Each structure stands twice: as structure tokens, then as C-alpha cells.
Curated annotation (Swiss-Prot):
Record protein name field: Ubiquitin-conjugating enzyme E2 21
Species whose genome carries this gene: Caenorhabditis elegans
Family to which this protein belongs: Belongs to the ubiquitin-conjugating enzyme family.
UBC core domain: residues covered: 21-168
Any single Pfam family the record assigns to this protein: UQ_con
Pathway field: Protein modification; protein ubiquitination
Residues annotated as domain UBA: 172-214
Amino acid sequence: MSVSKLNKMQFSDKMSNLALARVTRKCKEVANASDITEAGIHVEIKENNLMDIKGFIKGPEGTPYAGGTFEIKVDIPEHYPFEPPKAKFVTRIWHPNISSQTGTICLDILKDKWTASLTLRTVLLSLQAMLCSPEPSDPQDAVVAKQFINNYPMFTATAVYWTSYFANSKKDVEPDFNRKVGRLIEMGIRETEAIVYLSCNNWKLEQALQFIFD
């Protein structure tokens, strides 16, 4: 290898390391920012590993998610900020723009609306805002979106139940929901699966049973 080529490689590595250090510093600044903590958002970056960022978002008051804490996994890609972070909900949530099964998020700034001027702060605050303003017309989870549109009270009660069970809120839930979950558990269905089956069938026990055993 020629000296000039080696020098170019070393220069490229140095620039990559500088870019990584700059991005890491900026992400840490977001994690420690007062507006983030005041909004009820906590960020953990383990050992400067931008592939292992955890966000914890408190559910906004006045929503079915109030009282819950939702964990989000964030990965900062190699070409950030020229491509968006990858984010998904680790804590399960009943929301039309978030998959109830995988935590995949439908949010435009995580896709085609991302620009290099946006930041990790923007992502976290936008995710929290999304809990206040679901968009069922552009869903990630079609089942949740259908319930939101056709039976909003049922959607709200279901979202409250999921927030209580998965996100540890202290909100009161529909007693009848607990009874129906108990019935499925007695039949050998695991509790988490029972909640999902009933939620997807508007908490109609017979309909859920037909879905399970057909």
C-alpha cells in the first residue's frame, strides 16, 4: 500500500472518529437537557454506545397513557444526522401509529420527512406528542386504528388497560376486562396473549375464543 493511500485511510478514520465523538456529545447533551427531563423523558446512553440508547417517556396527562412509563429503543445510524435514528417501542402500547405486536412506529420524521437539522431531541418530543394526537388515518396497526375510528370509548378503555398492565400505570381499568382475561387464563391461555386476543376482538369473549381456536 502506498504512503499516500495509507495517509488517506488514516485521515478518513480520524474524521469518522471525530464525527462519532461529536454525535455522541450531542446525544448526551440531549439526555441532560432540562426541557427533556421536564417533559418527563429520561435518556440512557450506555458506555457511549449509540446503538444502545434507551428512552423512557411518561404518558401525557389527559391521555389513556397517563401514569405509564414507556421504554423506547433508539439506534443512531452511521450516517446520522443525514439519515434518521431508528426507534421502536419496547413497552407494548395500544396506539394506532405503533404496532401492538412489534413496537414499530409510523412517524414521518423517522422516514421521508427527516432532515439533517432534526435531532434526537426532536424524535423524543415528537414521540411523546404522538401519544397525545394519534393519527388513525395513517396507521401502523390497522386493528387498533379500526377500533379507534369505530368505537373510540372501547379504544380508550383498551389503551388504559394496556398502559396499566404493560407500562405500570395506577389507573383504574374495566373490571369486566380482568374477568375475561381470567376466563382465558383458566383455559390455558397465557395472560399476555389473553389480553391481545381480547383487545383485538373488542373484548368480546366468544369472538376471542373463536379467533383462538378456529
